[in-house]
């Protein structure tokens, strides 16, 4: 996974996608 986001207010749609793809 690129970047370490976890249930955060993602501004970009690709960020949310990556988080969901964990």
From Swiss-Prot:
Optimum temperature is 55 degrees Celsius. Serine protease that selectively cleaves Arg-|-Xaa bonds. Detected in muscle (at protein level). Not inhibited by the metalloproteinase inhibitor EDTA. Signal peptide: none annotated. The keyword Chaperone does not apply. Belongs to the peptidase S1 family. This is Myofibril-bound serine protease. Disulfide bonds: none annotated. GO terms for cellular component: cytoplasm. It is found in: Cytoplasm. GO terms for molecular function: serine-type peptidase activity. Optimum pH is 8.0. Active from pH 5.0 to at least 9.0. Its main location: cytoplasm. Keywords: Cytoplasm, Hydrolase, Protease, Serine protease. Its EC number is 3.4.21.-. The keyword Cytoplasm applies. GO terms for biological process: proteolysis.
């Amino acid at each position: 996974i690129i970047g370490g986001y976890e249930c955060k207010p993602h501004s970009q749609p690709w960020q949310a996608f990556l988080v969901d793809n964990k």
